[in-house]
Structures are given as structure tokens and as C-alpha cells.
């Protein structure tokens, strides 16, 4: 017997692929009168990216701060959009490795399913980049709906 869908975790990186997944998440939430849990994960900036020669630690902290501010701003915009669409939603900004945090949040918040966008990478770029969606699919304990970005 299928369990009722009460809470849908929608994972976003604020990309075009994520926007398509949002449409799907909103439709599923409407059809099931479910709550949407909107999750964005702020991944740590590689220390090497800041560069030791350029004030390393200080620059690293500044980059992290800007990323956090941008993520908060994007989340507020998204939540306003959902509110206008009359969708029950909660937001969750997390720090860490995206696929780990998404899977953990789904489990901790008892999500019935996860909706996530894929960038539709194939071949070598997928092999090297890996895929957050792919990792979520293989690690999640609930159903995962992937929505292709193109």
C-alpha cells in the first residue's frame, strides 16, 4: 500500500535545472496537499580556491560570507514565490556536502520523497563532475524524482 505523500523535499542550487524541478515539486505538492521542504546546501569553498597568496584565510571567509548571503537572498525570493502560489513551504539552508545534507534532511524531516533537478550532463563531464542528483538517488531511503534541466 502506497504511503500518503505529506512532505516533499525539493533540493535546489538555484540553477535553471532546479527551476524545472521546482515546477514538478509544486505540482506534486498541490496534487497531494503536501508541504514542501525547500533545501539549499552551501558547499564549502575549497581553501585552495582562495589561494594562499591572496590573504588565504581572510579571503576564504569573505567568499563563504558572500555565498551565504546570496543563498539567503535566493531562498527568500523562492519562498515569496511559493507563498504567492499558496504552497505550504519551509526553507532549510544547510552547510556541507550537498548530497549528504539532502539525504540527511530527507530522513530527519521525514520527507515522503525528494525532487531534484539534473543538469543533463553526459559522458566525460558527468564522469568527472559526478552528479549530486545521482548520489542522492543512490543514497536516499525515500523515492527520488529527478527532473532533467533541458
Residue positions per predicted region:
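Structural beta-alpha unit
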Residues: 1-4, 31, 77-114
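Small/aliphatic-rich secondary-structure junction motif
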Residues: 2-58, 81, 85-87
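Gly/Ser-rich helix-loop-strand patches that form or flank binding pockets
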Residues: 4, 27, 104-150
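General small-molecule cofactor/ligand-binding pocket signal
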Residues: 39, 90-94, 145
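Hinge/beta->alpha junction and helix N-cap segments in small-molecule ligand-binding domains
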Residues: 42-43, 68, 97
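Generic structural signal for helix capping and beta-alpha/helix-loop junctions
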Residues: 45-46, 99-101, 123
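A short acidic, glycine-rich active-site loop
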Residues: 57-73
